[in-house]
């Protein structure tokens, strides 16, 4: 991993529909200067407001990550951000003409492929890195989800999910090198259970979802 900041060589666009809104949307990745980070630009709104992908702007994590700044929202951004982090891209301006990125096939692979096609460019500025010095734990009491960050000399992310269903059981995955993200993780797709579909539709969600986009496993063996 280089210690220099990176961006992309050229702009590149993807088009599709938002998984929850069902609206047509165009997203364009653009090169950005050092220390820009990940910034979304709502080109469909007056003034084309910017929303930085920072934790302080996260207002909802149910069925996706939602950012909000000055009343402007952006939903379901996690696959876009996963592609950027997985390819170790530090700076990019993301123009979008709707409140939700295109879902593509339900994974981050289309974004990874587009970013690689645009090409990566090293910038003449050093990366700013966080060093974890103490154990940090956060638990969401409502969902039961928990995350723990532990000081280490090596990079490793381990995730475990258990939906209390026979069809999926308990599943684990680990990532120790970001260079493995493209081949081993970028094809991972969002999904929902069949018993959830009616509830999601009643809540005005998954309007842009097709079965080939978001698999819906049964939560039993029958």
PLM features per residue range, with description:
Residues 2-48:
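N-terminal basic/disordered segments at the start of proteins
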Residues 9, 22-24, 91, 133, ...:
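Broad gene-expression machinery/nucleic-acid interaction feature
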Residues 14-17, 28, 81, 144-150:
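A generic local secondary-structure boundary/capping motif
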Residues 19-21, 31-33, 45-119:
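N-terminal, charged/glycine-rich beta-strand/loop interface patches
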């Amino acid at each position: 991993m280089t210690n220099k900041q990176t961006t992309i060589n050229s702009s590149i666009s993807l088009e599709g529909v938002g998984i929850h809104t069902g609206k047509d949307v165009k997203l364009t990745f653009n090169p950005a200067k050092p220390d820009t980070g990940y910034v979304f630009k709502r080109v469909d709104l007056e003034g084309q407001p910017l929303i930085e992908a920072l934790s302080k702007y996260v207002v909802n994590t149910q069925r996706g990550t939602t950012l909000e700044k000055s009343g402007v929202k952006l939903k379901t951004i996690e696959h876009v951000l996963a592609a950027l982090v997985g390819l170790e891209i530090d700076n990019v301006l993301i123009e979008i003409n709707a409140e939700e990125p295109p879902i593509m096939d339900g994974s981050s692979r289309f974004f990874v492929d587009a970013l690689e096609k645009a090409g990566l460019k090293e910038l003449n500025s050093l990366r700013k890195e966080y060093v974890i010095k103490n154990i940090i734990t956060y638990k969401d009491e409502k969902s039961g989800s928990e995350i723990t960050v532990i000081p280490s000399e090596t990079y490793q992310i381990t995730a475990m999910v258990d939906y209390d269903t026979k069809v999926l059981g308990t599943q684990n995955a680990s990532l120790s090198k970001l260079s493995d993200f493209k081949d081993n993780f970028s094809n991972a797709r969002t999904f929902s259970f069949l018993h959830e579909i009616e509830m999601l539709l009643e809540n005005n969600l998954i309007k842009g979802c097709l079965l080939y986009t978001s698999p819906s496993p049964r939560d039993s063996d029958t």
